[in-house]
């Protein structure tokens, strides 16, 4: 059984017991998160596609950890002017473990 959920403006295909990194969610470690924006639920040959979401479908997950991704380096420069600006960015994430899919 798998489902497609929306979290942080992105769509994720999830299965029960799977761990994945999502955009930062304001829930403490060990807490439970419920995703009600479920776009698709599939159980073998029984596939339910929402328009836009599947009514009554829900995915529950447990928050495992919070952290930051690897650093992304950004370089801006102006040609022929000897001007360069170096910047970096590290995006926050929340790692969750999918505990249940209903619907």
UniProtKB/Swiss-Prot annotation:
Q: Which InterPro entries match?
A: bL21-like, bL21-like_sf, Ribosomal_bL21, Ribosomal_bL21_CS
GO aspect biological process, one term: translation
Query: So which domain of life are we looking at?
Result: Bacteria
Any one Gene Ontology cellular component term annotated for this protein: ribonucleoprotein complex
Q: Which UniProt keywords apply?
A: Ribonucleoprotein, Ribosomal protein, RNA-binding, rRNA-binding
Entry's Gene Ontology molecular function annotations:
rRNA binding; structural constituent of ribosome
Q: Which SUPFAM superfamilies match?
A: L21p-like (SSF141091)
Cell inner membrane among keywords: no
Looking up Pfam families in the UniProt record yields: Ribosomal_L21p
Q: Which family does it belong to?
A: Belongs to the bacterial ribosomal protein bL21 family.
Function of this protein?
This protein binds to 23S rRNA in the presence of protein L20.
Xref: NCBIfam families? L21
Q: How does it assemble?
A: Part of the 50S ribosomal subunit. Contacts protein L20.
Q: What is this protein called?
A: Large ribosomal subunit protein bL21
